[in-house]
Amino acid sequence: MRGGPQSALDPGADHAAAVYDLTLLLFIGGGAIFAAVMALSLYAVLARPERFPGARAWVFGGGILFPVVVLTALQVYEFGIARRLTAPTGQDTLRVAVVGYMWWWEVRYPDGVATANEIVIPAGRPVEFTVTTADVIHSFWIPSLAGKIDMIPGHVNRLTLTAHKPGIYRGQCAEYCGAQHTRMAFDVTVLPPDRFADWLAGQERPAAEPADPVLAAGRDAFLKAGCGECHTVRGTPAAGKRGPDLTHVGSRPTLAAGTFPNGVGSLAGWIAGAQHLKPENRMPSFGTLDGETLRAMAAWLESLK
């Protein structure tokens, strides 16, 4: 992937491709104006006065008319792109709601499916993101798929795109939002339509009942520690809404909004030292848990695929 998974120079969706084309055109148009103005400036400085006939015509044509024509053409083209990107969507459009928090992302699909810090969408199908924030201003940006759009308290913005290339793309908050702004990332996975349907069906299922005694002990420890006051795990009594939905947390590639790779070790470290690893986030550290309990809890969470 040219430039990596977070590069606007390698568009993987129609929205990003339009932004890329517009950027190139604006660069070329601006470069043409710059070159013309510099050439005329050099000519005016170096040429003898008698070799500079019709000075007013040169000033009007090169200094006013040429930039106005070029900039007007670029503006008309830009308006056309903006109108196309904001056109109403059809019935086949997948609608995904994203809410920004300090410092993580809540993602909701139709039929009650919820995830966090991970977005999965189908290739070749329009997707409309409705974005807002629960606290401060954030900015939702997936450079390889679309331009950025602000998330404003009390207001819903919309962004529509159609991804063409399956793959994993990285998104990032692009508006400074506090101490952990740089650690507020997310992954966007674009899947073929059949694989997306399988993924969505799997996400709709509640957490499986653990057959392993260690995993069952981890679940019980999770509930006893009060984690269910903030987190939801469908299929258990945990129904909190303050933090990310953890029903299928084990299937996510990263933890803490792209800060760490997912796994038993990372989960245990996060539970024990969330404030040390990501200071000022809203999850307290549970450093008083003994090692056995911590490992069991982390193993159970990792099993939630």
Language model: regions and residue ranges:
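Extracytoplasmic electron-transfer domains, predominantly the class I c-type cytochrome c fold
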Residues: 201-213, 237-305
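Electrostatic cytochrome c docking/interface patches
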Residues: 112-117, 194-223
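Sequence context surrounding c-type heme c attachment/ligation sites in exported
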Residues: 185, 216-228, 237-245
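Extracytoplasmic entry segments of secretory-pathway proteins
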Residues: 1-123, 207-208
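Residue-level detector of conserved, well-ordered beta-strand and adjacent loop positions
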Residues: 99, 174, 189, 247-250, ...
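The canonical Cys-X-X-Cys-His
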Residues: 173, 218, 224-234, 267, ...
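Short, non-ligating residues that shape and space the ligands of small metal-coordination modules
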Residues: 179, 236-237
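Membrane-embedded segments
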Residues: 102-106, 115-116, 120-192
